[in-house]
Amino acid sequence: MNIMNSIKRFAGTLLLSLAAVGPALAAPAINTFGEGGGYFSDPKRTDTAIRGYDPVAYFTDGKPVKGSDKFVHEWMGAKWQFASQDHLDKFKAEPAKYAPQYGGYCAYGIAEGHVVKIEPDQWSIVNDKLYLNYDADVSKKWKQDKAGYIKKADASFDSVIKK
């Protein structure tokens, strides 16, 4: 009798858990967030996104700008730094608008099936979304077919990130 009750309790708990997680699993496969946070961290494991560069500056200034430790916001398991209070406020209001695609990893690398770090000065904005790349050579390849690489990366991000 105890075994049956335990099984029923476990099954009930499992069903409730799946019901709670189900909507998240049904969400679009590609987003800028990453599951569980940490995707945006720099390779030195400091938990600082984009190596301390201001994500809003790519859109407002048209170039990478180093953020300040005076303007910091934690989001999705990483610390984001900003060049100004205005940029910090913009990010807080719409983080998904300013955060880089594919969790901040190299967009070309994701398209090719690899999780690769980035250099903040290798970037592009396509359809109001920020894409970062590994280095100048990779950026050249990326720029030859941005739409094609975005399509490939969108289709493979979830499987690549789980490797």
Annotate each predicted stretch with a short phrase:
Residues 2-14:
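Bacterial N-terminal signal peptides that target proteins for export
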Residues 6-9, 21, 46:
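A generic signature of intrinsically disordered, low-complexity regions enriched in glycine/proline
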Residues 13-22:
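Bacterial N-terminal signal peptides
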Residues 26-163:
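Charged, low-complexity intrinsically disordered segments
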